C-alpha cells in the first residue's frame, strides 16, 4: 500500500484516485479550491466533474499543496497543461525527497512546444526520481463506473514504468500495458484532441460517418507524421495511445473536444463554446502548439492547419472542410510508406 498524491481534482484526476483507492492505496487528492476539497471530505462527492459518484474514505481532499506532498514518493500530475508549470514551481518549494511523477495530462505547450514530460523534467529535475506518462482511451466517466479500460504507460526508465503499471493495474477493470516509446505515447495522447475537435465540427455540420471516418484515418496519419519527426516509433500510433485514444475521443459524447467541435460546427463562437463547457478543452491550445511545431519542422498537417484557421482566424467551418476536400490528388500508400520510411 502506497501513499499517493493526485494533483488536480478534475474528472480524470478524481477517476484515477478512485482506481488507486480500489487498488488499496491511500490517496491525497489536491485541489486549489477549498470548497471543492470540503465537498470531497464531507460529502464524499465531486459533483461538478463526476456527478453521482461516491468517493471512498481513503481518498482525502487537500487544498494545502505542501501537506498533500508531504512524505509521498508517487505524484500523479492531473492538472490542465496550461497550469502544469505553475503547479510544479509551487510543488518544488514543498518537496524534501525525490518523487516519481505520473503525468496524465495530454497536451503540448504553445510557444515552447514541449511535451508534459519535458516540462516536468525542466521544472523539478532536482527532485525528480522518474517521470512516467499514462495515456490511452480512458474517459473518466466510464472509469468511475468501473467499466473495462485499458491504457499504456511509458518512461525513459522502463523499470519505473513497470512499477507504475503495478500501482494502477486492476484486474477487474483497469488494464495497463507498458510501451518504451515515450515520445509516441505523449504525442498520440496530445494530438488526438485536435482531430476530435475536427470530428466534432464535421458532426456539427451534419456530415455523417463517412466524413468522420476519413478525418480519423487521415488525422492518424498527421499524428504519426509529426510524431515520427519528433522521434516516435510509428507503431505506437497503431496502439492504445494512438488509434485507441483517437477513436474514443472522436466518437464519444464524453469527449470535451468532440463536444466543443460539435458546437463550433453548429455555428457557435469559440469563446462562447469554451465558456459554456466550464472545463478545459485541451485541443484548442494543442492545435496552436502543433500548428507552430509543424511549421517549424516542415511537417504537412492539413487538418491541423484548417482547424487552426477555424479556431484562431475565424474561418467558417464549412469552408474549412471544403478546402480539405479540394486539396490536390494524393497517393495514399506512398504517404503511409513515407511515414514509416523515416524510421
Curated annotation (Swiss-Prot):
GO CC terms: cytosol
Residues the record lists as binding sn-glycerol 3-phosphate: 106, 136, 138, 192, 245, 255-257
Localization (cell): Cytoplasm
EC number annotated for this UniProt entry: 1.1.1.94
GO molecular function: glycerol-3-phosphate dehydrogenase [NAD(P)+] activity; NAD binding
Chief localization: cytoplasm
InterPro entries named among the record's database cross-references: 6-PGluconate_DH-like_C_sf, 6PGD_dom2, G3P_DH_NAD-dep, G3P_DH_NAD-dep_C, G3P_DH_NAD-dep_N, NAD(P)-bd_dom_sf
Any one GO biological process: carbohydrate metabolic process
The keyword NAD is annotated on this UniProt entry: yes
Pathway in which the depicted protein is active: Membrane lipid metabolism; glycerophospholipid metabolism
Catalytically driven reaction(s): sn-glycerol 3-phosphate + NAD(+) = dihydroxyacetone phosphate + NADH + H(+); sn-glycerol 3-phosphate + NADP(+) = dihydroxyacetone phosphate + NADPH + H(+)
Similarity comment text for this entry: Belongs to the NAD-dependent glycerol-3-phosphate dehydrogenase family.
Name this polypeptide is given: Glycerol-3-phosphate dehydrogenase [NAD(P)+]
Species per Swiss-Prot/TrEMBL record: Geobacillus thermodenitrificans (strain NG80-2)
Gene that produces this protein: gpsA
Amino acid at each position: 500500500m502506497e501513499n499517493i498524491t493526485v494533483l488536480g481534482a478534475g474528472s480524470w484526476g478524481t477517476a484515477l484516485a478512485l482506481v488507486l483507492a480500489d487498488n488499496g492505496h491511500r490517496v491525497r487528492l489536491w485541489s486549489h479550491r477549498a470548497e471543492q476539497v470540503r465537498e470531497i471530505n464531507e460529502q464524499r462527492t465531486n459533483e461538478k466533474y463526476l456527478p453521482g459518484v461516491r468517493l471512498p474514505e481513503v481518498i482525502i481532499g487537500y487544498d494545502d499543496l505542501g501537506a498533500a506532498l508531504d512524505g509521498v514518493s508517487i505524484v500523479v500530475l492531473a492538472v490542465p497543461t496550461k497550469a502544469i508549470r505553475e503547479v510544479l514551481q509551487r510543488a518544488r518549494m514543498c518537496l524534501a525527497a525525490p518523487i516519481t511523477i505520473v503525468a496524465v495530462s495530454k497536451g503540448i505547450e504553445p510557444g515552447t512546444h514541449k511535451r508534459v514530460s519535458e516540462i516536468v523534467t525542466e521544472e523539478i529535475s532536482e527532485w525528480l526520481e522518474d517521470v512516467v506518462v499514462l495515456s490511452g482511451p480512458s474517459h473518466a466517466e466510464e472509469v468511475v463506473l468501473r467499466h473495462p479500460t485499458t491504457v499504456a504507460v511509458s518512461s525513459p526508465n522502463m523499470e519505473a514504468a513497470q512499477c507504475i503499471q503495478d500501482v494502477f493495474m486492476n484486474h477487474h477493470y483497469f488494464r495497463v500495458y507498458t510501451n518504451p516509446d515515450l515520445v509516441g505515447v505523449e504525442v498520440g495522447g496530445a494530438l488526438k484532441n485536435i482531430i476530435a475537435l475536427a470530428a466534432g465540427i464535421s458532426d456539427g455540420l451534419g456530415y455523417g460517418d463517412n466524413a468522420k471516418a476519413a478525418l480519423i484515418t487521415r488525422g492518424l496519419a498527421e499524428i504519426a507524421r509529426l510524431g515520427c519527426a519528433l522521434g516516435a516509433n510509428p507503431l505506437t500510433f497503431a496502439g492504445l495511445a494512438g488509434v485507441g485514444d483517437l477513436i474514443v475521443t472522436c466518437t464519444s459524447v464524453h469527449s470535451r473536444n468532440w463536444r466543443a467541435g460539435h458546437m463550433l460546427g453548429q455555428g457557435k463562437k469559440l469563446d462562447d463554446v469554451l465558456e459554456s463547457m466550464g472545463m478545459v478543452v485541451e485541443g484548442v491550445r494543442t492545435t496552436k502548439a502543433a500548428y507552430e511545431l509543424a511549421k517549424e519542422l516542415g511537417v504537412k498537417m492539413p487538418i491541423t492547419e484548417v482547424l487552426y484557421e477555424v479556431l484562431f482566424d475565424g474561418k467558417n467551418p464549412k469552408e474549412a472542410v471544403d478546402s480539405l476536400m479540394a486539396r490536390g490528388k494524393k497517393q495514399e500508400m506512398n504517404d503511409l510508406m513515407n511515414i514509416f520510411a523515416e524510421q
